[in-house]
């Protein structure tokens, strides 16, 4: 099985290697021997975390994530994952690709619902993030 892990920021030399390295340590522990994960940054989009609050950059970012999912399907990946709890692009890309798309936010919320009636989500202290996550959970 081949899975494409799509980062949520523009490819930045140095930072991307560090971020993907941290993520890789987590999934390598549970990855099946016959499964390959290919990590991808975006060609256009968020250049740094502060751009998160800029509507223009988030718009570019969303389009780039959807394009990355489309490319993953064309390249024969069996599934794709977005590398952010916000599940950027999952809903939009699901309308145009047939491969499974996985977002850690929805996956985590659904798992938490199996464990109990109440749960909490800890998020970054960034403008606009709390309403976004609340909307994501209600959906």
Where are these regions (language model features)?
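N-terminal glycine-rich anion-binding loop in soluble enzyme alpha/beta folds
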Residues: 1-59, 125-139
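Periplasmic-binding protein-like
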Residues: 6, 74-84
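Short, well-ordered alpha-helical microsegments
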Residues: 87-91, 108-109, 129-130
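Short, acidic/small-residue loops that bind anionic groups at enzyme active sites
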Residues: 94-115
């Amino acid at each position: 099985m081949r899975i494409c892990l799509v980062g949520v920021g523009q490819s930045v030399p140095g930072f991307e290697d560090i971020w993907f390295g941290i993520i890789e340590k987590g999934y390598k522990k549970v990855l099946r021997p016959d499964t390959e994960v290919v990590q991808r940054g975006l060609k256009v989009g968020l250049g740094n975390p502060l751009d998160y609050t800029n509507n223009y950059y988030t718009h570019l970012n969303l389009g780039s994530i959807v394009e990355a999912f489309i490319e993953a399907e064309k390249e024969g990946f069996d599934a794709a994952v977005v590398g952010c709890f916000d599940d950027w692009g999952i809903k939009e890309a699901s309308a145009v690709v047939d491969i499974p798309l996985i977002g850690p936010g929805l996956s985590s919320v659904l798992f938490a619902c199996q464990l109990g009636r109440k749960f909490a989500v800890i998020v970054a202290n960034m403008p606009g993030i709390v309403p976004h996550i609340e909307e994501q959970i209600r959906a």
